[in-house]
Every structure is written in structure tokens, then in C-alpha cells.
Amino acid sequence: MKHGLNGLLLAFQFLTTVPITRQIPWTARSARWSIVCYPLTGLVLGGLLVSLYLLLSPFLSPLVLAALLVTLSIFYSGGLHLDGWMDVSDAFLSRRDRETKLIILKDSRVGAFAVMTTILLIGWKVLLLMELIALAPREFTWLLLLVPVCLRWMIIVQLIYGKAASDQGMAASLLPYVTTHVKNASRVWFLFIAGACFLLLQNVILTLCFLLMIWLFPLFWLRVCKREIGGMSGDTIGASIEGGELFLWGIMWTFFLSVTA
């Protein structure tokens, strides 16, 4: 129980800006539990997003609501995932060799590719959320809860099936703790997500499409990372959350647009 609680606190310290000042011991068991608890940090974010949406939707336009939801997501993670997105954009779009791309990933400076892709990322997120608010307000409410959970679960999927691009960094430090315990917990999380989707969305085709996409995206992203830099890193994992969110909202928008057309 103690190790589980420590793992939960470590997960929130690492992935969120929730003010946890307590010094948590980093042990093998607490590290494993931390990985298992990643989706819980998404569940809390989902709860905050749903609360904000329900509270302000009677008073604000879809555009302002969408902008506030995106802003809350960024501040909740402290811009951690967005930083990964920017680093990966500069590295992957540089068209350099693998070693140079790894150097660019470690460079704290922001390049032109990072600026351009971040503007596009945030702009398209706001646009898609605004569209979904208008197209399917009921389903959108539940997707706000489910998507952050799925994105953090996809971190576990990448740790299970991927390999580190280098011997240093976040990904390399976490891989030794991806044990059978973590893999079994990942399966339990997927069953929970699947059950919640069927229960809340009440649409079999939508649910099956959603579940298929949250499986395919991390596996596809791992292939991209392997081709570009030989594996994954902390930055690529962060980028997968940002890119994965845009991908899921895009798929959901396409689905509802085709249904209402």
C-alpha cells in the first residue's frame, strides 16, 4: 500500500503541476507503481476539463471554451509534453542524421520548426474542440474525461513495446521497471477504458473506432521514432501525448461529421 501511494505521488510530481512538496523515495517498487498510475493523472485532468466545460458552457462561446480547455491542459502538465513536442519537431524535421537529431533533442533552444508546429498544434486543437462542442456536445463531455486517461495509458504502451534511443534520459531510466506487474496493469487499464467507453459513449461503432485508434497510434509512433532516432526518449513520449491528443480529436471530429452529414 505504501509503495502504491508513493508511486501515485511520483506520477503526479512527474506529469503534473499538482503541488506535492513531499520528498518521495525512488525505489523499484515505487517506480513500477508510478508507471501504473500515469492514467490516474489523466483521469484527474479529465475531471477538471469536464468540470470547467459544464460550468462555463452556458455562458461562453464554443471558441472561448475550446481555448480555455486547451490552456488548462497545458498548465496542468506545466508544458512538459508541449516541450517534448517542440524538441521533437526541431529534431525530426531537421532532416539530419540520427546522432545530430539526438543532439537537437537535448538542445534547450527553440527552433523555427518548433514554433511553426506548436502554432499549428494549438490552433488545430482549439478548432477541433470548438467543432466537437457544436457537433456532439453530449459525447464531447465524456471524451473530455476519457481522452486524457487514454493518452497517459499510451505512455505505458510505449514503454512496454518500445526501446530507448539512448542509454540516458527518461525512457531509458523507466524501461527497467516495466515488469509483468506493469504489463498486467496496462491490460486492466485497457479493460477499464473499454468499459467506460461503452458505458459513457453508448455508441458501439464510435467506441470500437476509439479503442482501435488508442492502440494503433502509440505503435505507429514507436515505428516513427525508431526510424528517426533509433527508439524513444522522454521528448518523444511527451510529443506522443500532444500529437496523440490532436489525432484522437481529429478522428472523433471526422466520425461525428460523417454521422451528421
Swiss-Prot record:
Subcellular location: Cell membrane
GO biological-process terms attached to the record: cobalamin biosynthetic process
Superkingdom assignment: Bacteria
UniProt keyword annotation of NAD present: no
InterPro entries attached to this UniProt entry: CobS
EC number(s) reported in the record: 2.7.8.26
Keywords, in A-Z order: Cell membrane, Cobalamin biosynthesis, Magnesium, Membrane, Transferase, Transmembrane, Transmembrane helix
Keyword DNA-binding: no
CC per GO annotation: plasma membrane
Protein family according to the UniProt entry: Belongs to the CobS family.
Principal localisation: membrane
Bilayer topology annotation: Multi-pass membrane protein
Catalytic activity: alpha-ribazole + adenosylcob(III)inamide-GDP = adenosylcob(III)alamin + GMP + H(+); alpha-ribazole 5'-phosphate + adenosylcob(III)inamide-GDP = adenosylcob(III)alamin 5'-phosphate + GMP + H(+)
Positions of transmembrane segments: 4-26, 40-60, 62-82, 110-130, 140-160, 197-217, 237-257
Entry protein name: Adenosylcobinamide-GDP ribazoletransferase
HAMAP family xref list: CobS (MF_00719)
Cofactor: Mg(2+)
Gene Ontology MF: a single term: adenosylcobinamide-GDP ribazoletransferase activity
Recorded metabolic or biological pathway in which this protein acts: Cofactor biosynthesis; adenosylcobalamin biosynthesis; adenosylcobalamin from cob(II)yrinate a,c-diamide: step 7/7
Stated role: Joins adenosylcobinamide-GDP and alpha-ribazole to generate adenosylcobalamin (Ado-cobalamin). Also synthesizes adenosylcobalamin 5'-phosphate from adenosylcobinamide-GDP and alpha-ribazole 5'-phosphate.
